[in-house]
Amino acid sequence: MVSERLLPKEIGVVEGIVDTGIVVIAHFENPARKHAFSFLKEILAWKRKCLIPVTAILGAYHIMTKYLGVEDVSAYKALTKTLETRSPALYEDVSIDSALDSLTYALSYKIESWDGYLIYLAKKFKAPIIYSIDHELAKKVKEIQVINPIPPSIFELYNKWIREKLQPNP
């Protein structure tokens, strides 16, 4: 079957790159889900030209099931529905060269290798923004904007909710 997906060279101007945290929040019940889901929905419909690395979906499954206590079947169903859209926003490539560049950025900025990969993608596609909930990344990277697309008041509610959820029972 021939897919009608856009090849990276045909994408044109890319607004931004989407980090794993946004994907996570959009795929399980929480106070910020509606906002994260709405944001991803626009991207998957290609109304906003942002790229979501497919590897972010894999990372989201790990975070959801291992750290947030989301049932594995629920995480699987939610994330596979997103992948099954086969949206041109889903970026599939991790080459050896991209991994090398990602590690170089990680070393240079003293950040995680994943964040180095996001910087690599932003530079590769000349995207001026990384959409992320990682405020530490925003402090360290100056030439690319790091923006949380979830409104601050909603994100504050999410953080409070997540702290309570992850707090051990006395």
Name each model feature, range by range:
Residues 136-137, 150-159:
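Short, acidic/turn-prone active-site loops that include or flank metal/cofactor-
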Residues 1-52, 70-74, 155-159, 163-170:
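Short, well-structured N-terminal submotif of metal-dependent ribonuclease cores
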Residues 37-51, 55-108, 120, 158, ...:
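PIN-domain endoribonuclease scaffold, especially VapC-family toxins
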Residues 130, 146-153:
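Short hydrophobic/aromatic-enriched beta-strand-loop microsegments
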Residues 137-144:
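Short loop/helix-cap segments at secondary-structure boundaries that form the rim of catalytic
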Residues 21, 54, 96, 134-135:
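Alpha-helix N-cap/helix-start capping motif
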Residues 20, 112-129, 136:
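Acidic, metal-associated active-site segment
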Residues 25-27, 63, 140:
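Residues that scaffold the ATP/ADP-binding catalytic core of kinase and kinase-like folds
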